């Protein structure tokens, strides 16, 4: 009893031309880079507690992007990752721009007040004679 594999007669003529015509290989090209989920950036944006909870929205979309990437749906993962990136950028802008504007207002206000104080000091240092009161 012969149980060896393959169970073909090695002396039989092979039809390589028929096999080559029956099988076709399709090359789709190299897959693109894996989508980014921006998870770490979203976690830090969430921890900073910025305006309108944009960091939390970024974290939600980052988790969805990671889930879709693990499921193999790369296009949905790219879309969720892109939304997470946009929310992170908005959160960073809402976090950085108002304090910078406030700092600019304080500096310009201080400069303006120092100029007013300088002008008013000259006014109060004026000495009047007794003849001026008559």
UniProtKB/Swiss-Prot annotation:
Residues 1-20 have a biased composition (Basic and acidic residues). GO terms for biological process: bone mineralization; bone morphogenesis; in utero embryonic development; regulation of bone mineralization; response to rapamycin; response to tacrolimus; skeletal system development. A lipid is attached at residues 52-53, 86 (S-palmitoyl cysteine). It is found in: Cell membrane. The chain crosses the membrane at residues 40-60, 89-109. InterPro entries: CD225/Dispanin_fam, IFITM_antiviral_protein. Induction: By interferons. Interacts with FKBP11. Belongs to the CD225/Dispanin family. This is Interferon-induced transmembrane protein 5. It comes from Mus musculus (Mouse).
């Amino acid at each position: 009893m012969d149980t060896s594999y393959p169970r073909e007669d090695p002396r039989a003529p092979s039809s390589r031309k028929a096999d080559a015509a029956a099988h076709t290989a399709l090359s789709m090209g190299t897959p693109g880079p894996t989508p980014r989920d921006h998870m770490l950036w979203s976690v830090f944006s969430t921890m900073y507690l910025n305006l309108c909870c944009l960091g939390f929205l970024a974290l939600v979309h980052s988790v969805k992007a990671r889930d879709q990437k693990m499921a193999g749906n790369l296009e949905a993962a790219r879309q969720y990752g892109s939304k997470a990136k946009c929310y992170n950028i908005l959160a960073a802008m809402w976090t950085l721009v108002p304090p910078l504007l406030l700092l600019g207002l304080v500096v310009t206000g201080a400069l303006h007040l120092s100029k007013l104080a300088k002008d008013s000091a000259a006014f109060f240092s004026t000495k009047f004679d007794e003849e001026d009161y008559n």
